[in-house]
């Protein structure tokens, strides 16, 4: 069975290389190694180094370079809205406090149907109604950063080298500052002042 060992994030997907799609709910979009069958019947083995979250529009690259694009499946959700932003923030806090996956938009929060949680949210003054739509819950900060880094690695390669050089410049500056501090080790500590990089004066400053 052909394998897929690489995720191509949606901004980097080339439509001409997409040969099939695979429709997955939010649970199935968090995988490391599993046999999959695409919507058009193509079978392949997802075999990643570590578990990763697949976003709608991402693609799985097969060993021969072809792509299978990911589609988020419609799911039974509830839409949570309030008449003011503070109540929506309060609802978000209670959802997060229970570690419930949630999708947050400007106007609403979406979660998987949960009668107990829905009753609690209504008690907080939120309007709760069932909807059917793709579910794209928020990811943890580390997962989001990792996905961003994976998808933008090539774009940032040159930028990273520039920062590397910049880091060395700072290192030399730190050593120079360290040497300056040693030169003043024997200096009378009664003067409590800082010497600037361009200070050419001696050590006879008097301070009020």
From Swiss-Prot:
Start and end residues of each stretch annotated as Disordered: 145-195
Main location: cytoplasm
Keyword Hydrolase belongs to the record: no
Cellular compartment(s): Cytoplasm
InterPro entries registered for this protein in UniProt: UreE, UreE_C_dom, UreE_N, UreE_N_sf
Keywords, in A-Z order: Chaperone, Cytoplasm, Nickel, Nickel insertion
Keyword Cytoplasm annotated: yes
GO cellular component annotations of the record: cytoplasm
Family: Belongs to the UreE family.
HAMAP family tied to this protein: UreE (MF_00822)
NCBIfam families per record: PRK13261.1-1
Protein's job: Involved in urease metallocenter assembly. Binds nickel. Probably functions as a nickel donor during metallocenter assembly.
Name of the protein in its database record: Urease accessory protein UreE
Organism: Azorhizobium caulinodans (strain ATCC 43989 / DSM 5975 / JCM 20966 / LMG 6465 / NBRC 14845 / NCIMB 13405 / ORS 571)
């Amino acid at each position: 069975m052909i394998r897929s060992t690489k995720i191509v994030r949606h901004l980097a997907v080339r439509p001409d290389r997409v040969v099939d799609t695979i429709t997955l709910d939010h649970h199935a979009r968090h995988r490391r190694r599993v046999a999959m069958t695409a919507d058009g019947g193509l079978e392949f083995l997802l075999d990643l180094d570590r578990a990763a979250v697949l976003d709608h529009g991402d693609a799985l690259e097969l060993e021969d370079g072809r792509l299978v694009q990911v589609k988020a499946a419609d799911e039974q959700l509830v839409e949570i809205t309030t008449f003011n932003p503070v109540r929506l923030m309060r609802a978000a806090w209670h959802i997060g406090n229970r570690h419930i996956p949630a999708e947050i938009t400007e106007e609403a929060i979406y979660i998987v149907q949960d009668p107990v949680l829905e009753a609690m949210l209504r008690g907080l003054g939120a309007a709760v109604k069932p909807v059917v739509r793709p579910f794209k819950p928020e990811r943890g900060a580390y997962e989001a950063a990792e996905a961003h880094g994976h998808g933008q690695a090539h774009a940032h390669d040159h930028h990273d080298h520039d920062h590397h050089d910049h880091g060395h410049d700072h290192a030399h500056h730190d050593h120079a500052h360290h040497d300056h501090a040693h030169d003043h080790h024997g200096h009378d500590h009664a003067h409590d002042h800082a010497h600037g990089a361009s200070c050419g004066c001696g050590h006879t400053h008097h301070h009020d």
